């Protein structure tokens, strides 16, 4: 029941309720909610608050779009129990950086967020038209529309 190795979980959990069970049982040291799975910014903030009360850190999982990634970045900047965030924009399709103008690139493990309104992204309509949506399958077998 006890280990010196930190336990992290939560990539595939939905909403604050399963996270609450983990927190109540003191079953993890690090929670990894995913903004696309766990219910968006508001739900991630609630999960973070619940975890903070029990001295559990947050390391958000991120496999969604650049919009989801930057929303998580803004949240991480504002939660005291933030530890680290999964960031793999270098693996995104290169056109994402043209479509989502202002998406931050990491340097030495850090990103600098824009102080522009909203998420700080501008969508380039001309670039979007060059990449019409197509259907793809996600890890859970569901269909996604992506560009």
Which residue ranges define each predicted feature?
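Shared catalytic-loop signature of beta/alpha-barrel
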Residues: 1-110, 114-117
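Extended hydrophobic packing segments that form well-structured cores
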Residues: 119-147
